[in-house]
Regions:
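A generic short-segment signal for beta-strand/edge and adjacent turn/coil regions
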Residues: 1, 11-13, 30-36, 94-97, ...
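Generic detection of short hydrophobic beta-strand segments and adjacent strand-loop junctions
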Residues: 5-11, 36, 74-76, 142, ...
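A generic structural signal for ordered alpha-helices
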Residues: 7, 19-22, 104, 111, ...
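The phosphoinositide-binding surface of pleckstrin homology
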Residues: 2-16, 110-114, 131-132
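Acidic, Ser/Thr- and proline-rich intrinsically disordered linker/docking segments
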Residues: 43-119, 145-195
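Polar low-complexity intrinsically disordered regions
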Residues: 1-2, 195
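Phosphoinositide-binding peripheral membrane targeting modules
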Residues: 14-54, 120-165
Length: 195
């Protein structure tokens, strides 16, 4: 995706709700009348949840919350009911991919630079160190070669490869979870190629 690309999505809330426009541009992200400068974006959390009436699944709600300058949040929500707008699952995935490619990779890269310069960084309660990962403040340091991770639909888990009971779980609908998982993936990949 080129830096000059502008991507727009038309989204609906509810069965007959009005359309809301989400625009990704080189210098800004805009949702309806709210515009955020790219430099101000600091984090994202997102999820898809089911709409249940009585015991029946009747639709899906797609939620994204983007944190930007001074801890302000932009909420983007759209949904589908009764099989209408089935394409929204693909739209949701496309929005997340576009957000990453155009904005969020830069946020993660800045955090990685801080980790390299300082030799430690705490994200979402997990401490990343040159020698490994500490899952909690009082926990032991798990060496990088023993750090494992598993990704699931709505969360991921970090664990000690030899002692799976030593682990931590993070929901994708939690602040800093995307940053943490991306840094773990990147560091593990870099260390695998160094061997």
């Amino acid at each position: 995706m080129s830096a000059a690309t502008t991507v727009t999505y038309d989204l609906r809330k509810g069965l007959w709700g009005e359309k809301h426009k989400l625009t990704f541009a080189q210098d800004f992200l805009q949702y309806d009348d709210t515009r955020i400068a790219v430099a101000g974006i600091t984090d994202i959390k997102h999820r898809m949840r089911w709409i249940v009436w009585y015991k029946f699944y009747v639709g899906r709600v797609y939620e994204m919350v983007i944190r930007h300058t001074e801890e302000e949040e932009l909420r983007i929500t759209f949904n589908s009911y009764f099989g209408l707008r089935k394409q929204y699952m693909d739209v949701y995935a496309g929005i997340i991919e576009t957000f990453w490619a155009m904005y969020f990779q830069k946020v993660v890269d800045r955090r990685q630079l801080v980790l390299r310069e300082r030799g430690e960084l705490t994200i979402s309660g997990v401490q990343l160190l040159d020698e490994g990962v500490r899952f909690s403040e009082q926990g032991e340091i798990v060496p990088w070669e023993k750090v494992g991770y598993a990704e699931y639909y709505s969360y991921f888990a970090l664990y000690h490869a030899d002692r799976a009971k030593l682990n931590v779980r993070r929901d994708f609908y939690a602040w800093e979870s995307e940053i943490l998982l991306s840094l773990i993936r990147t560091i593990k990949a870099e260390r695998a190629t160094d061997i």
